[in-house]
Each structure stands twice: as structure tokens, then as C-alpha cells.
From Swiss-Prot:
Superkingdom of the source species: Bacteria
Name of the protein described by the UniProt record: 4-diphosphocytidyl-2-C-methyl-D-erythritol kinase
MF annotations from Gene Ontology: 4-(cytidine 5'-diphospho)-2-C-methyl-D-erythritol kinase activity; ATP binding
Native source species: Pseudomonas putida (strain ATCC 700007 / DSM 6899 / JCM 31910 / BCRC 17059 / LMG 24140 / F1)
Principal EC category: transferase
GO biological process terms on file: isopentenyl diphosphate biosynthetic process, methylerythritol 4-phosphate pathway; terpenoid biosynthetic process
Lineage summary: Bacteria, Pseudomonadati, Pseudomonadota, Gammaproteobacteria, Pseudomonadales
Residues bound to ATP: 94-104
Pathway assignment: Isoprenoid biosynthesis; isopentenyl diphosphate biosynthesis via DXP pathway; isopentenyl diphosphate from 1-deoxy-D-xylulose 5-phosphate: step 3/6
Active site (record annotation): 11, 136
Family: Belongs to the GHMP kinase family. IspE subfamily.
Record's catalysed reaction(s): 4-CDP-2-C-methyl-D-erythritol + ATP = 4-CDP-2-C-methyl-D-erythritol 2-phosphate + ADP + H(+)
UniProt keyword terms in alphabetical order: ATP-binding, Isoprene biosynthesis, Kinase, Nucleotide-binding, Transferase
EC code(s) of this entry: 2.7.1.148
Function comment: Catalyzes the phosphorylation of the position 2 hydroxy group of 4-diphosphocytidyl-2C-methyl-D-erythritol.
Length: 286
């Protein structure tokens, strides 16, 4: 195989509790990740000269600092391959939105290049490499909805319901560093240590601080909250609410479209990236 095109799906944090702060400054979390059937798309073409080249410029992100390029070069170095790749990105997911755009792109890059370069790397090894790029990368590498602990890297598969979501995208980028260093951030939630999604006693501990500091996010939560429970994902800026059908979700988004930007997407416990990879494996073995 010389070329490969794969999706990089969005994720939601259905809830996010901060249960402590480690000596190294990182926060101990409990959260549930679920994927959306909505995301970026990446195309890869094999090179035999070892060059890694991303042909899509991302504003304010230098080429060599892009997580896609960093993931590709790290996999190249760790595997010892002499092959390279040309990479093109169709960017759909917002930066600083809390829906995993950069982490998902990095995970898709690792899985795609392991396939193109015919590396004998299993999911565990790719996820461990992904963790060095970001705490959210492993869940995208593994591709199954998960209850996460630690800094978000200790994953236990779960299967929450898969509703339709309205996701609103406030036109502001939230700084994760700013939120996690904020003095008013809750850092002492009681550990649930529960694998199922808790009913009625879950929340996003980052949400009060983000609402306080980002009025655009507060407005989005208030707008969506008129129709269903609205919640922040990650540190934002995106907010989401669940609906039982696409028709209901589409109707609500249409009603909000005069003042809010967003999209409708289906929740999925198996990422569309992994569904695509599974179909490729079936085709190649047929």
C-alpha cells in the first residue's frame, strides 16, 4: 500500500472529575471518553527517502511543532524505519476546543504510518509512544470509549449509550494550562473508581472556572441548557448536550444557529478511525 486516508475523530469528556494534584504538578483525573462520528481527515503517501512532510499549514503552529509531524518523526526514530511520508490534513475540528483535535491527529498518524510502513507494532506499543505526545493520545490509539484515570492515560473500556449530540463551538480558544493552574479549580473531588458512567453525580470540574473566565463559553452553555443538560468537554471551549435522535439534535442546532456555531454528531463507543482500519484489514485478508 502506497497511500492511505483515515479520519481523526473528535471525543467528548462525558464528565471530568479532578481528584488530586501530583508532586510533578500534573492532575489526577477520572473521566469518561466517548468518540464522535465527526472529525479531521488525514491522507498519507509513502516516501522512500525518509522525509516527513506535512503539506497543510496550520496557523500559528510551525511545521516541526505540529503533533502530526512530531508523531511521525517519533515513530520513525523509535522503529528505525528508513521510510518517510507526505501528509495532508483536512482540518475540521477547532483548536483549543476540548474535543481532542491535535491528539486525534497524532493518533491517526501513528496508526496510519505503522500500517504504511508495515511495522510490527501492537496497540500497546503505539499507545505508550502516543502518551509521550499527550495524555489524550492513547484513547484515540485504542479506539474504544473508556473510563480514564491517572492523568487520563489509564484506560478501562466502557460502553455508555450512544446518543446524538449537539456540540457548540464558541469562537474562543481556552488555555488548558491556564485552567489547570487556576487557584479556584476544584482539585479534591472524591474518587468514584467506577467503571460505569455515574448517574446524577457527575460533572466537569473545569466548567465553573471556564464559565467565569470565558463569557462566550458561558453563553453557549446557557443557550444549549434551555433544551437539555449542557456540559463542557475537557477544558473547553466546546460544550455539548445529548438528544435521543438526529432529528431532535438538528432542530435544536437550527434554533440556536442565529447566535451559536456548532454541529450535530453521533456518539460512538468504537471510533470511526478504528472502524475504517478494521475494514481495511478485512479487505486485505479477503
Amino acid at each position: 500500500m502506497q497511500k492511505l486516508t483515515l479520519p481523526a475523530p473528535a471525543k467528548l469528556n462525558l464528565w471530568l472529575h479532578i481528584i488530586g494534584r501530583r508532586a510533578d504538578g500534573y492532575h489526577e483525573l477520572e473521566t469518561v471518553f466517548q468518540f464522535l462520528d465527526h472529525g479531521d481527515e488525514l491522507s498519507f503517501a509513502l516516501r522512500d527517502d525518509g522525509v516527513i512532510r506535512l503539506h497543510t499549514e496550520i496557523e500559528a503552529v510551525p511545521h516541526d511543532s505540529n503533533l502530526i509531524v512530531r508523531a511521525a518523526r517519533m515513530l520513525q526514530a523509535q522503529s528505525g524505519t528508513t521510510l518517510g511520508a507526505d501528509i495532508w490534513l483536512t482540518k475540521v475540528l477547532p483548536m483549543g476546543g476540548g474535543i481532542g483535535g491535535g491528539s486525534s491527529d497524532a493518533a491517526t498518524t501513528l496508526l496510519a504510518l505503522a500500517h504504511l510502513w508495515q511495522l510490527d507494532w501492537d496497540e500497546d506499543r503505539l499507545a505508550a509512544l502516543g502518551l509521550s505526545l499527550g495524555a489524550d493520545v492513547p484513547v484515540f490509539v485504542r479506539g474504544h470509549a473508556a473510563f480514564a484515570q491517572g492523568v487520563g492515560e489509564q484506560l478501562t473500556p466502557v460502553d455508555p449509550i450512544e446518543p446524538w449530540y449537539v456540540v457548540l463551538v464558541p469562537q474562543v480558544s481556552v488555555s488548558t494550562v491556564e485552567i489547570f493552574s487556576h487557584p479556584q479549580l476544584t482539585r479534591d473531588s472524591l474518587p468514584l473508581k467506577m467503571r460505569p458512567v455515574p448517574e446524577g453525580n457527575s460533572r466537569n470540574d473545569c466548567q465553573p472556572v471556564v464559565e467565569q473566565n470565558y463569557p462566550q463559553v458561558r453563553n453557549a452553555l446557557n443557550s444549549l441548557g434551555k433544551f437539555t443538560e449542557a456540559r463542557l468537554t475537557g477544558t473547553g471551549s466546546c460544550v455539548f448536550g445529548a438528544f435521543p435522535s438526529k432529528a431532535e439534535a438538528d432542530k435544536v442546532l437550527a434554533l440556536l444557529s442565529a447566535t451559536q456555531t456548532g454541529f450535530v454528531a453521533k456518539g460512538s463507543n468504537i471510533s470511526m478511525l478504528h472502524r475504517k482500519l478494521q475494514s481495511l484489514v478485512k479487505k486485505s485478508s479477503a
